[in-house]
Amino acid sequence: MAKKSAIIGFKGVALAPVLQDTITAYETGEAVGIQYAGSMTRTPKESSQELYYDDDLYAQLREVSGDDVEVRFAEIPLDQLAQLGLGRYDGETGTLEADFNVTGRTYAFRCVTGTVDGLPMFFNWRVFELTGLRFDNFATRSGSLSVCEVIMSGVFKRPKLAGAAAYAIRQPKDDGTDLAACNAWIAAAETLPKA
């Protein structure tokens, strides 16, 4: 029977700070995990143009520059929200002084998904420009068991380094012998081009 690797889960989100993203090099630090990921939605950022010559369609040009991304979490601790750029956290008082804007924060976005066959898949989007962190709408508990999620928004982009892929996907061998290496891959710092 053929292997079934349709994705059925989403967990293990980790963000690695992008330390360098230039036309000559790409480098990240080690990734830091964020628990309780709920869902991720992506919408392609694309433009297209049809070129007509001699009253006929000559070419259709299409450019996909990335994805608008929204990730929902059950919670993110206040100190971790501060590390992501939402504000300043005072550990002594347990207070986060925050603003509505998160600017200038770029990470590699990594996550793990489950599959029908039970063998996970590991994703690494190399450039995730964080554009927002906010709490979802609040609702009374009466008749509702919903959670006020923390919503992280941003854009997946291509690295500036020529030839560097926008993302990488890894899946362990069927026998799972390299599962530890896959888990380490999600957390590790990355440098391109490879030495």
Identify the residue ranges that each predicted region occupies.
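N-terminal interaction modules that seed assembly of large macromolecular complexes
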Residues: 27-64
